[in-house]
């Protein structure tokens, strides 16, 4: 998948893709979990309680996968941004929202080693490249640059 995605990408994105390639073995080491993942976690596939902001349901599990943990965590970027035909626009507070997500995630997950945190980031980036790496030429570069260079 990554070899197919890499064709024609600018060097700055190739460097990020190389980081993912180097980290992929960590996703398949003994002890690193696989998990059922939604794999299409877009804003129209989850229900939120408007009063509390809590997720109350997730729908459309047809594309669910079992994969190394974290492959679908790139969906966070889709939730705090919007894709148009010519650009990726992030919510004005996307930095704070992203920090809050990861702070909460790691607090709720409990003890996670530094190595597993790196593996989660590799999995997240792999998911972003897999999901957005097959867009049309110009859109592909724009989306990958916006989403993977954070």
Feature map (PLM): residue ranges:
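An alpha-helical support segment within catalytic cores of ATP-dependent transferases
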Residues: 1-39, 47-54
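Helix-rich C-terminal or lid/interface subdomains of diverse kinases
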Residues: 63-68, 75-150
